[in-house]
């Protein structure tokens, strides 16, 4: 059984008041780096970080060091995602991996190395992070969302990022896990359940735009996933208790027609710098007016 968590974990710590919620979104997750920089420059620091998929990566780095310098380090990590081989290689190489594994196209080893290189030395477990941190993955055996609040940090982040078909399911304990976005893509409800009263939602821009009717067969899956993730987020927002304030931070621009094949371009890291800058400017302006 994997090391689990519930809302009573870390009870020796005071209840959080300010949470950063970092959603999933593949290559579009670079937007969250700009948002983090704007938040930290404004003096807004979290006492709880929860993340899903690529948001688990960004969240782990900021939970390890909630400073502007950490946001700048994250920008370097995102530059590395395009060069590290996480989603690179020839079509022949990907077919070789698929033939051996029969379940996925890429090895998770490059992503593991990149994470280990960008996390502080000596921070191996979630409990060692200065800011309480949780990330979510989807348990295959239990068909349920699973929250990691303790245990090996990199393993938990890899589990949250295990995109079906691209990366192998990650085994932690006796369970196997897939990408947390399958279960809870923008986990506002988790932050509120843990006691947060002010929640900053860092998302990649999709929920800012209406969905489009699919035009091509492969767009149907993208639209279906968007409906599921937006429904969960809308339900969390509708269930907010009195006194909880939620800030949905702006991404700074369109991400393309929602529900199209472009949404599935998981290797499109070439625009990371532009996405970071755009989200930074939009979020800084939002915070100045808040």
Language-model-derived ranges and their functions:
Residues 1-52, 60-290:
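Patatin-like phospholipase
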